[in-house]
Design a protein with these regions (language model features):
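Membrane-interface helix termini and inter-helical loops of multi-pass transporters
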Residues: 2-5, 94-102, 193-204
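Conserved small/polar residues in nucleotide/adenosyl-binding loops
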Residues: 219-223
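Small-residue-rich segments of transmembrane alpha-helices in multi-pass membrane proteins
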Residues: 43-47, 84-90, 115, 137-148, ...
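Small-residue-rich hydrophobic segments that form or flank transmembrane alpha-helices
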Residues: 13-79, 141, 156-218
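Transmembrane helix exit motif
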Residues: 62-72, 107-133
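Alpha-helical transmembrane segments of integral membrane proteins
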Residues: 10, 14, 52, 103-110, ...
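Small-residue-enriched transmembrane helix starts and helix-helix packing motifs
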Residues: 2-25, 132-146
Length: 223
């Protein structure tokens, strides 16, 4: 993929740098913020190509967040979510295999719509949410998170809703979220590189230019 053909104008660069800034801020626990970057990049560079462009940015932000909060994760929740998330991950790959390429943008749009519905549901239920004690609650959010992260890198709000619903403290929330996505996002790299051909040496150079904007998470971290 020739990324030089996709990023040609100051507007394209502006969208890329703004998205990196948003992603960096989202890693500090600002619920739903990362959803803004997904449609921005998809509209600018195309639905499927944008997933390969955004993934290294997410991986850099995840690594910084883990280095910053590495000692305060609640691992029992990471281990509870990961198996179902991997099932969702594989399910997303199977769905991608059977749909025509032109339908990917609709699938991504559907994932974003589902995430928004879950966010609205969470706000509506508020403190009255009694489902978090059900046995299927964690696996459901893991499955949904795995599917939506593979298709649209849109699982941030899904995980935020789950971790907040189990009454996780602020610092533990950020640390647990960071470790979960570090594992999931780094697992996605081989798929993007070798199956979807969305990550190239050229795209990685472009992503490297966004690092100063990602570093904003160090200044917006909760204190």
């Amino acid at each position: 993929m020739e990324w030089s053909m996709l990023i040609q104008s100051p507007t394209d660069w502006g969208i890329l740098f703004l998205s990196a800034l948003i992603i960096g801020m989202s890693k500090t626990g600002i619920q739903g913020l990362s959803l803004i970057s997904v449609p921005l990049l998809a509209l600018a560079f195309g639905a499927k190509p944008s997933t390969g462009l955004i993934l290294p940015i997410l991986c850099i932000a995840d690594l910084i967040a883990v280095l910053y909060y590495r000692r305060i994760a609640e691992w029992k929740y990471v281990f509870k979510l990961l198996p179902a998330a991997l099932v969702g991950f594989i399910l997303a790959l199977l769905v991608d295999k059977v749909i025509p390429p032109a339908a990917f943008k609709h699938l991504m749009g559907g994932c974003l719509a589902i995430v928004l519905l879950v966010m609205f549901w969470s706000e509506w239920k508020g403190k009255e949410n009694k489902l978090s004690s059900c046995w299927w609650y964690g696996p459901f959010f893991g499955l949904l998170g795995g599917f939506t992260t593979m298709i649209g890198n849109a699982a941030g709000p899904v995980m935020a809703i789950y971790l907040l619903s189990v009454k996780m403290p602020k610092y533990s929330f950020v640390g647990t979220n960071a470790w979960f996505f570090l594992v999931i996002n780094y697992l996605k790299i081989p798929v993007q590189m070798f199956a979807w051909n969305n990550i190239t040496s050229q795209s990685l150079i472009i992503d490297a230019l966004t690092i100063p904007f990602i570093l904003c998470l160090l200044y917006t971290s909760p204190s």
